[in-house]
Amino acid sequence: MKLPEKKVKKLIGMMNSLTQVKIPPMKPILEIFDMAMDEKTLDYLLRVGTEEHTLRDLKKLYIRMYGRADYDANWENFWKEIYEMSFLIPGEEDSEKFLLATIFPGWIELSVSGPLNKKRAAIIEKFMTFWDLLRKVNIAPIRMLTDMQGMRELKTNEPHMSTFLSTGKKAVPLNEPLTSEHQVRTAGDVYELLARHKDQLSVMNCICRTHKQISGGGDCEYGLPIEGCINIGPLSRQLVDNGISRRLTYEEACNLIEDFEKKGCIHTLFHYGSSTDKEAINICNCCNDCCLLYSSYQKGYISKVFVKSFYSPQMIDESRCTGCNKCGKYCATGATYYDKEAKKLVFDYDSCVGCGQCVTQCAFDVRKMVPDERPVFAKTRKRA
């Protein structure tokens, strides 16, 4: 059904107020809300607002809005739908309370990342029509303006994401928050995080790889499975209850991380409100083939690669390089590759996000990763 647009835009504004990632109320997004909820749910969420609530409080609100008779007849199914769609998720401060979810990252991928059905497939396809606009608007004037904005933010704002090495065992203290949207940590750090939440771990389908398959793109060229996003903490419990996620033991989660590591993943941590000064709730294992962030960047979508990097590669001995170009295949931003004509390695420091895959995938110890904290904005490429 088509929802009242004014109400939907108000809810979008409320959800956007809880995150650094603002999703504009464009037509595909409005249509996703039409597909995902009815007006009764919309009205209820508008009344819930942006504060955290206990389940008891949420029940009382429903009774005030619709009456005791309606509550007795309909509350159970009404709550089941809200819970399963992840419109409300466990609060950050108190996991026994519930908080309005953000849009993306948020309830869109949380609601569609279980076993595929028609509704989930339709929402994914509709969201990708929104995401594709980032490519359609990549024309010279807009590309220039967005790059100028990105360079200004590089000097004045905190980055949207953080990247750590994707290999190695040196731990970065997990109690030191980073003021950015997402973190990408070393495999060693990820193991430490998994251990901290070892009783609340699960894995769900990756929305990016799911879309590639249903749109006819086939399997991930890096051999990564559809099940690729690891959930941690109270949200993991909710997603298991919903049938979205599959529960994992600590050992199973570590084995997945090890496998993803070898295949070239960047371990990206998502947090409440896409802000790393808040608790982590999800580890997305990104690749260059399927990932909305990196694959889209390489194909010429308006760049969303604005990260805080903590490492960069340093040359040990370039004469060891055999020209295999594995570094180029696994580099997320094209910052390094082997130039066959010049017969040398190319490296663009300004585009390097410090993921470490150029070192991980190299069998000849040509480079090593060294500490180097800096913001990075990868300028938009021309459309492929």
Per-region residue spans from a language model:
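Catalytic cores of enzyme domains
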Residues: 139-310
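Short acidic, hydrophobic short linear motifs in intrinsically disordered regions
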Residues: 51-65
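A short, conserved structural fragment
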Residues: 80-95, 336-337, 367-368
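Ferredoxin-like iron-sulfur electron-transfer modules
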Residues: 35, 67-70, 98-100, 270-282, ...
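Short helix-coil-helix linker/hinge
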Residues: 35-41
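Long, low-complexity, charged/polar intrinsically disordered regions in eukaryotic proteins
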Residues: 1-31
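Short amphipathic alpha-helical interaction segments
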Residues: 68-84
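Short, amphipathic alpha-helical interaction segments positioned at domain boundaries
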Residues: 95-137
